[in-house]
């Protein structure tokens, strides 16, 4: 819902205004009602005594808008959709009006009005709550200074020219309000207008359109007329007004009766257009609330929802059609389905548009087939006059109430001025390549493009303010208008339609336009290369204009591109040109693989790009004939540097924890940027680095498929854009969208695109990984078909697929059994455009699939700009919202590597790890006090450890005093041929009893592995839990995380609270360490030592047994209890645990009943037994410093050393006690826990 409060001032008294407005309403009703397709029916006009405002006049009217809707559209819609109902309660000086449509249930306009004798200074006339006051927008209408549309202007209705003969008033000057406030009379109409159109995809656009055109423009002209007609009403009384109203009602009834009995010719040959207030004039006969009525014929809210028929709606007359199959019944079925989709889901979950989203002025064109985002402007208003009025988005005049938010124009200037000398407040710049959808028939107007950007900006601001406050004021948006390359192709294809001769035919609205052919024809044109060069030039101009603006002074942040349906195609080829021309480190041979001949396959000779080598691909130069005839106008390419509304302006916070990946994704540009070139050239490129490229429903996949068809030897991966990552966002029902991933790896056609989480449910994401490596690992069976996969029978091995073969059972998995098995995975990683998935599917109502295909591109194109799902997704990719966490050690710490990045020791390393993510891990180490302390880790890259880090330096850091959060560098090791390293802690630096976070940082790229070093006393008691055997309530091979058994966390916490060391064991391979620890953290399991199998093995139970044996024999732990599955009974028996110490979860097995205790009643009943004291015993020995307790998921204090009597049970004297008096073990004073963050160089 969009709420605006209008203040309308007039130099007259309240009594005069009441007569003036009522006279104006009845007069306009007479003049502008022409019949059934354009007219008003007055159903009721009677007084009331107990209603809104007390006693007053009630009116009920029906507006007929059929003549203002295209003929093919009228044929589809039932009659009920061509009517708008108005109910009005007039208790002057208070009035209330409500507009509804019987066909669109979730559409409404509510208007409340107070008429007061003041100058509009009262801040809260309607007693709004704090939330409503923050949401509303104030807008003052000036009948003199605000311009009207050119088609509505009349000199006799201009207050600057009008002079009343009878009263002597006028003409009015520009400062008339100040003069009237001093001399009087002066009155103000306070109008609170609430517009709601809660249907998917178009909510913000339609609500803003109704406000700007349907309400403001109508009210402005109506009040100008009320002033300029005063010679006609000044001598009338209220009795005269009531008589005129009755006469008008009879006349309108006769006129409508004639139309109902006459022919239907009015639809085929509609009468002359009445003026804009045709319906508003008759909207309130007997009611001074008339000017808020729906807008005029060509700019009306009813026309807007008529044209926006693809938004959900429901016909109240659907039963009339029965079972007959007709255009009307078909349309009703579609509307009912999409409306039902809206009703079955809560409003918080279904609608992408949010309260307070705003847009600039826009008007729908006349035909759905010509309806596009470039034409949402007033058909009568010129751009110059639209800019001159404060109403089309002039926030400086409308500011948000109560000073909660200053006008954006002044806010941007002030903020930039304050920061100019220090640092740029903007950390992320989005350049929006806006060309429209493939059905746009022309370039449209710049204001309509700006309106889409403003809608997106409002969505950014709303989402950022609620869920990403650290980014508020640090994100800017800039518009880059792009040529409408599909316009000529659309005009050509439209003329080829079998129904092109019949412009009003119903069949023309059906799917006779081959949408897929439009981008293919457009990109095959000889003019396409010139369009790409134009986009490059305009993008550079927009970027340089931002740098020259106060807001962008000193900008060194990351730059991302956003491309709509057609703009995405142009942006992709612009990035390919940039890669070909070379942009710093991006100008490598692997990226320079796009030539100009590929942009237009029909242009120039077709040849094999691989025959000439990769360098040969960049030799082509654009044809001079493709050059634009003149230079690009600067006003079209560069937005205003000041006062622009397409950036999210906010006063920067004094301290901000948000630092995007600035150093790695962008560079500080020079003050001056190259101007737009006159035409494309071999060196045409973007002047900045691009971190990410977001596509909004772009048919780029079809274009790339065509190029591969024309040049079979060309691989899509060769056309590598000069950006770090591409995000292809689309709706599944969008006929224009296409996937990109199957072009890079054909087997991805069997993998569904990732689903973008709904913002209302998961504003910060649902936790799903976007990394390509994780997808390859999850679907490893598709890419490693040569290996025989089997699922182990042991419950502890439910982690994933294990490979069968003797070589894998003995050799480290760093050396695969067959090199060919991972070659395809490596090939995919090398060819991919980034490190994340590319295709992302957005939510849309299923009922949209039933609509004519030709209407969907317009709807989907408009939906992206207001989608909170899209905005939240983009922000999550740009912002490091969640810092890397030390899952094994509770809390991260402030950390900056002591050694800067160095060149790799081996030249091949840089090539091997390109486009693959790190998968380093280090094993948790448990050491008995006084024994050698040895740390081990393994450094791998890619899914399934396809790349090994060999012969590279790794720095080892240990947090010796966890309370301080300070990392100490202990030494440097070099990885071996298997990517492993072993680091013995020097004896002179051996650590005392406690838990110490460890980090092993790769010197070359500062990726790292984490673990914990646990030093315990001899005889420390421990409890062992098998993760898959005792915790999981469901089986998960490689997919979603398994469920946790009820009460499992409480049982583990009980043992920890009793002072026992917790040991977790699992048969999963160590490559899954991060996922398993994240699962433990998600369910708030207490902290403990976690053990994994060393790589892939066919006998995970044997490795678990060996690990536990080492704890008993080498660490001298005393294991007092073990939990697991029936498979673990033999493992625990080998450790010497008695049946009373072995707990098996699940159904009892008869042959094992004598070897263990089955917890058939679950953990809850077992916990009751534990708490009853049946398994507790008093600690022996004196209290001493021991291990601290904490939880994975709960931030606990990091004082890891506490008194043993409270935390850990140990038997026997410690080493310090054996050696006699001396230096006591290191202890830390209790202190306040720190909330610490992690900051790596690679993330700055």
Curated annotation (Swiss-Prot):
Omega-N-methylarginine carried by residues: 1211, 1218
Protein source organism: Homo sapiens
GO terms under biological process: brain development; lipid metabolic process; phosphatidylinositol biosynthetic process; phospholipid transport; phototransduction; protein transport
Cross-referenced CDD domains: SRPBCC_PITPNM1-2_like
Keyword Heme tagged: no
Phylogenetic lineage: Eukaryota, Metazoa, Chordata, Craniata, Vertebrata
Region (Disordered): 258-331, 339-358, 581-682, 1206-1244
Modified residues (Phosphoserine): 300, 304, 319, 326, 329, 342, 345-346, 373, 382, 593, 600, 621, 896, 1237
Keywords from the UniProt entry: Calcium, Cytoplasm, Endoplasmic reticulum, Golgi apparatus, Lipid droplet, Membrane, Metal-binding, Methylation, Phosphoprotein, Protein transport, Transport
Bilayer topology term: Peripheral membrane protein
Stretches assigned to the DDHD domain: 686-880
Subcellular location: Cytoplasm; Golgi apparatus, Golgi stack membrane; Endoplasmic reticulum membrane; Lipid droplet
Designated name of the protein: Membrane-associated phosphatidylinositol transfer protein 1
Tissue: Ubiquitous.
Family the UniProt entry places it in: Belongs to the PtdIns transfer protein family. PI transfer class IIA subfamily.
Recorded GO CC terms: cell body; cleavage furrow; cytoplasm; cytosol; endoplasmic reticulum membrane; Golgi cisterna membrane; intracellular membrane-bounded organelle; lipid droplet
Biased composition (Low complexity): 299-319
Residues annotated with Phosphothreonine modification: 59, 287
């Amino acid at each position: 819902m969009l709420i605006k409060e209008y203040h309308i001032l007039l130099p007259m008294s309240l009594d005069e205004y009441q007569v003036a407005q009522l006279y104006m309403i009845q007069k306009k009703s007479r003049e502008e009602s022409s019949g059934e397709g354009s007219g008003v029916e007055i159903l009721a006009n009677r007084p009331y005594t107990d209603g809104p405002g007390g006693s007053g006049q009630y009116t009920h009217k029906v507006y007929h808008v059929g003549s203002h809707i295209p003929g093919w559209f009228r044929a589809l819609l039932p009659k009920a959709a061509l009517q708008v109902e108005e109910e009005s309660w007039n208790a002057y000086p208070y009035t209330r009006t409500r507009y509804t449509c019987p066909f669109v249930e979730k559409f409404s306009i509510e208007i409340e009005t107070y008429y007061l004798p003041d100058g509009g200074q009262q801040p809260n006339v309607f007693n709004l709550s704090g939330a409503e006051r923050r949401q509303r927008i104030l807008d003052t209408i000036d009948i003199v200074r605000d311009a009207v549309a050119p088609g509505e202007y009349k000199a006799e209705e201009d207050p600057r020219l009008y002079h009343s003969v009878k009263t002597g008033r006028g003409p009015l000057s520009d400062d008339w309000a100040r003069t009237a406030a001093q001399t009087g009379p002066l009155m103000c109409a306070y109008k609170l207008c609430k517009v709601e159109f809660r249907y998917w995809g178009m909510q913000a656009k339609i609500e803003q359109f109704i406000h700007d055109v349907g309400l403001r423009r109508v009210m402005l002209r109506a009040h100008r007329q009320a002033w300029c007609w005063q010679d006609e009403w000044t001598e009338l009384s209220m009795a005269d007004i009531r008589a005129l109203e009755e006469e008008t009602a009879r006349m309108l009834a006769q006129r409508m009766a004639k139309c109902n009995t006459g022919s239907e010719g009015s639809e085929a040959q509609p009468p002359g257009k009445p003026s804009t207030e045709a319906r508003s004039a008759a909207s309130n006969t007997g009611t001074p609330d008339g000017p808020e009525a729906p807008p005029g014929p060509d700019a009306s809210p009813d026309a807007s929802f008529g044209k926006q028929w693809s938004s959900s709606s429901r016909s109240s007359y659907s039963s009339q059609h029965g079972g007959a199959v007709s255009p009307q019944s078909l349309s009703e079925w579609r509307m009912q389905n999409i409306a039902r989709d809206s009703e079955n889901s809560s409003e918080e979950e279904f609608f992408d548009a949010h309260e307070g989203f705003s847009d600039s002025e826009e008007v729908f064109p006349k035909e759905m087939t010509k309806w596009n985002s470039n034409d949402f402007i007033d058909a009568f208003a010129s751009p110059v006059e639209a800019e001159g009025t404060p109403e089309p988005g002039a926030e400086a005049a409308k500011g948000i109430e109560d000073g909660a938010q200053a006008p954006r124009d002044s806010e941007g200037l002030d903020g930039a001025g304050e920061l100019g000398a220090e640092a740029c407040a903007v950390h992320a710049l989005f350049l929006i390549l806006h060309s429209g959808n493939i059905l746009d028939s022309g370039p449209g107007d710049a204001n309509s493009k700006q309106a889409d950007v403003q809608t997106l900006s409002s969505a950014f601001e709303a989402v950022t303010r609620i869920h990403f406050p650290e980014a508020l004021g640090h994100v800017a948006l800039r518009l880059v208008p792009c040529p409408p390359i599909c316009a000529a192709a659309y005009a050509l294809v439209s003329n080829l339609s079998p129904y092109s001769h019949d412009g009003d035919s119903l069949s023309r609205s059906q799917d006779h336009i081959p949408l897929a052919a439009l981008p293919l024809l457009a990109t095959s044109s000889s003019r396409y290369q010139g369009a790409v060069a134009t986009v490059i030039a305009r993008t550079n101009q927009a970027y340089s204009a931002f740098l020259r603006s106060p807001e962008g002074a000193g900008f060194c942040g990351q730059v991302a591109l956003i491309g709509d349906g057609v703009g995405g195609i142009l942006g992709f080829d612009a990035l390919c040109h940039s890669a070909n021309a070379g942009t710093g480190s991006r100008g490598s041979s692997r990226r320079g693989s796009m030539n100009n001949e590929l942009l237009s396959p029909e242009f120039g000779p077709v040849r094999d790009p691989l025959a000439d080598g990769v360098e040969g691909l960049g030799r082509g130069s654009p044809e001079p004939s493709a050059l634009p005839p003149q230079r690009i106008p600067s006003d079209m390419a560069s937005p205003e540097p000041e006062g622009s509304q397409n950036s999210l302006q906010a006063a920067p916070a004094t301290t901000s924890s948000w630092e995007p990946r600035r150093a790695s994704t962008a560079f500080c540009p020079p003050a001056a940027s190259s101007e737009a070139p006159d035409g494309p050239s071999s060196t045409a490129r973007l002047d900045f680095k691009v971190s990410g490229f977001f596509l909004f429903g772009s048919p780029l996949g079809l274009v790339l498929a065509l190029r591969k068809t024309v040049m079979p030897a060309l691989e899509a991966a060769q056309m590598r854009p000069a950006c770090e990552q591409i995000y292809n966002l689309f709706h599944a029902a969008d006929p224009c969208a296409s996937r990109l991933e199957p072009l890079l790896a054909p087997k991805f056609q069997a993998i569904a695109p990732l689903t973008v989480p709904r913002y209302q449910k998961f504003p910060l994401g649902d936790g799903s990984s976007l990394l390509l490596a994780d997808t390859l690992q999850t679907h490893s069976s598709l890419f490693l078909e040569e290996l025989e996969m089997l699922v182990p029978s042991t419950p502890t091995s439910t982690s994933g697929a294990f490979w069968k073969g003797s070589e894998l059972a003995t050799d480290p998995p760093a050396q695969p059994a067959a090199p060919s098995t991972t070659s395809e995975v490596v090939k995919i990683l090398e060819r991919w455009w980034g490190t994340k998935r590319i295709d992302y599917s957005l939510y849309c109502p299923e009922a949209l699939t039933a609509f004519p295909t030709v209407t969907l591109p317009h709807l989907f194109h408009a939906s992206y700009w207001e989608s909170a799902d899209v905005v939240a997704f983009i922000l999550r990719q740009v912002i490091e919202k969640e810092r890397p966490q030390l899952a094994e050690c509770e809390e991260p710490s402030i950390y900056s590597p002591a050694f800067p990045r160095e060149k790799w020791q081996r030249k091949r390393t840089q090539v091997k790890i390109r486009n693959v993510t790190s998968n380093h891990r280090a094993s948790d180490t448990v050491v008995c006090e006084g024994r050698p302390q040895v740390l081990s880790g393994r450094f791998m890259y890619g899914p399934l450890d396809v790349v090994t880090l060999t012969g590279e330096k790794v720095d080892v850091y240990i947090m010796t005093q966890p309370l301080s959060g300070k990392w100490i560098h202990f030494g440097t090791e070099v990885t071996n041929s298997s990517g492993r390293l072993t680091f013995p802690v020097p004896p002179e630096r051996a650590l005392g009893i406690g838990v110490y976070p460890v980090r092993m940082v790769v010197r070359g790229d500062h990726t790292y592995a984490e673990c914990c070093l646990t030093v315990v006393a001899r005889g420390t008691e421990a409890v062992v839990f098998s993760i898959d055997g005792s915790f999981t309530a469901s089986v998960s091979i490689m997919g979603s995380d398994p469920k946790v058994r009820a009460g499992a966390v409480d049982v583990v916490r009980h043992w920890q609270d009793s002072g026992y060391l917790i040991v977790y064991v699992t048969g999963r391979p160590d490559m899954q360490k991060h996922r398993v620890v994240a699962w433990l953290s998600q369910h708030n399991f207490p902290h403990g030592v976690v053990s994994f199998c060393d790589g892939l093995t066919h006998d995970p139970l044997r490795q678990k047994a060996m690990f536990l044996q080492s704890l008993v024999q080498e660490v001298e732990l005393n294991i007092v209890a073990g939990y697991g599955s029936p498979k673990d009974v033999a493992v625990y028996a080998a450790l010497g645990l008695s049946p009373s110490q072995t707990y098996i979860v699940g159904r009892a097995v008869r042959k094992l009943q004598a070897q263990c205790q089955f917890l058939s009643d679950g953990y809850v009943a077992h916990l009751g037994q534990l708490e009853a004291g049946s398994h507790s015993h008093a600690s022996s020995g004196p209290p001493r410093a021991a291990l601290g307790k904490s939880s994975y998921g709960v931030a606990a204090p990091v004082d890891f050393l506490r008194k043993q009597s409270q935390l850990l049970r140990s038997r026997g004297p410690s080493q310090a006690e054996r050696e006699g008096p001396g230096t006591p073990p290191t202890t830390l004073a209790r202190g306040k826990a720190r909330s610490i963050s992690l900051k790596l160089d690679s993330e700055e």
